[in-house]
Amino acid sequence: MSNVNMDFEQAGELKIGQVGIATLRIRTLNVPRLIQEMSDRVTRAPKLFRRTAVILDFGELPHPPDLTTAKALVDGLRAANVLPVAIAYGTNEIDLLSQQLGLPLLSKFRAHYERQEVAAPPPQSTPPINTGRIQHTTVRSGQQLYAEHCDLTILNTVGAGAEVIADGNIHIYGTLRGRAMAGARGNAEMRIFCRDFQAELIAIAGRYKVLDDIPTELRGKAVQVWLEQNQIKIAALD
């Protein structure tokens, strides 16, 4: 079984969401580097990332950026054809920063961090994965198929520009030419299985790889995709 590992550290971790909005989690406040990383993503996969909506998450930084730095980041991302639409992580400082930048602060992130500051709630159990959903026909370009709280099995092709999403695993018995996202609610144990692998994008629990990141020797092969130590792994099943 061949196994491909392409690990590298980035200043910003981009996670793909369920509704076409990505979250850019800022790990290192290096504005030129962050802008260059996003510009590289747009260059490698313009159909996926050009003018994509992005939520900025400064929650991993010890301190939020000052207004000048944050504005330079927002302006630089826009120049790179990436569109910041909101800010995550709702501390009072971030709330003020969002007002100064004219970007909304997402209420769900505000509530999450305010609860953490008061008292950490008991961990919530992951909803059980129910009986899977089966798709018999081709998923065509522009279509999106979502299997909530269950696995998704596709007995046909996922066309280029199509998107299949599941909270559980994804099994594709035809060709995958579009995008496949398993573990959509954050379950990193989920996997993608595909008989003919030619994907535009694959993601598990928000971590992703695009076509240019996938070795050519795996294209057209039967593969499985999983997450290990927050890195996407791809292995041939032949």
From Swiss-Prot:
Name of protein: Probable septum site-determining protein MinC
Cell cycle keyword on record: yes
NCBIfam families membership: minC (TIGR01222)
Subunit structure: Interacts with MinD and FtsZ.
PANTHER family found in the cross-reference section: SEPTUM SITE-DETERMINING PROTEIN MINC
Keyword check for Kinase: no
Gene3D superfamilies the record matches: 2.160.20.70, 3.30.70.260
Role summary: Cell division inhibitor that blocks the formation of polar Z ring septums. Rapidly oscillates between the poles of the cell to destabilize FtsZ filaments that have formed before they mature into polar Z rings. Prevents FtsZ polymerization.
One Pfam family of this chain: MinC_C
Disulfide bonds: none
GO biological process, any: regulation of cell division
Keywords carried by this UniProt record: Cell cycle, Cell division, Septation
Recorded family membership: Belongs to the MinC family.
